[in-house]
A protein has these predicted regions:
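Gly/serine-rich nucleotide phosphate-binding loop at the start of the catalytic core
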Residues: 6-16
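Extreme N-terminal starter segment of soluble prokaryotic enzymes
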Residues: 1-4, 40
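Ordered hydrophobic segments in well-structured contexts
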Residues: 4, 8, 32-34
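Short, solvent-exposed amphipathic alpha-helical segments in soluble enzyme
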Residues: 20-22, 59
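Glycine-rich phosphate- or other oxyanion-binding loops that anchor nucleotides, phosphorylated ligands
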Residues: 27-190
Length: 190
């Protein structure tokens, strides 16, 4: 059965999609862009909690897939524990949400780092300190995808790369580097 891989942006998936040996062909352009090879569906959700949850629900109704993988960028918070490193990949073990009325925590595995998801960018020092009370990594889609996976009975795993740690970072340059590193993980894509 196919695995569904969710990216927030095309930029994150760019090198994987461009690599001919992976054999991805675009099969859908609206309402979400989707590519497929023999092993995976790649779905571009758009940025944010709402886009991620809607894309997951749409994909779950339109395509047959088994396990789910969310791959993408994450920011470093001002977490008081073991720090995360810029440019490094982290497997996510737990996902929580910064937004009110989203108190559930999702355990994705025993090993890895915690991730907190936010409905808006976490870019100021104060915002990073607040997010750091919950997890060392922050994104804008993980919680929504974990919640949707639970609703649709899918096992989800997540891999995030630290692309930013302050408002002054070159997040777009770092995401391009991340995309190149993702494409080097051949076993995931073929």
């Amino acid at each position: 059965m196919l695995r569904a891989v969710f990216f927030a942006t095309r930029m994150e998936a760019e090198r994987v999609l461009a690599e001919k040996k992976f054999g991805y062909k675009q099969i859908c352009a609206e309402p979400f862009r989707v590519w497929r090879n023999r092993r995976n569906l790649i779905v571009i959700t758009g940025i944010g909690l709402v886009n991620a949850s809607v894309a997951f629900a749409w994909a779950a109704r339109k395509f047959r897939f088994g396990d789910v993988l969310n791959v993408g960028a994450a920011g470093a918070t001002a977490f008081g524990g073991k720090p995360v490193e810029m440019g490094k990949f982290y497997k996510i073990s737990k996902v929580v949400c910064l937004e009110p009325y989203n108190e559930m925590a999702f355990r994705l595995g025993r090993a890895g780092r915690a991730l907190v998801s936010s409905g808006s960018p976490v870019s100021t020092r104060e915002e990073r300190e607040y997010a750091g009370k919950f997890a060392p990594l922050v994104d804008m889609e993980g919680y929504a995808l974990a919640r949707a996976a639970e609703v649709f009975g899918k096992k989800i795993s997540m891999v995030k790369m630290v692309t930013d740690f302050s408002h002054e970072c070159d997040i777009f340059g770092n995401i391009k580097k991340m995309s190149e590193k993702f494409a080097q993980m051949e076993g995931v894509w073929i």
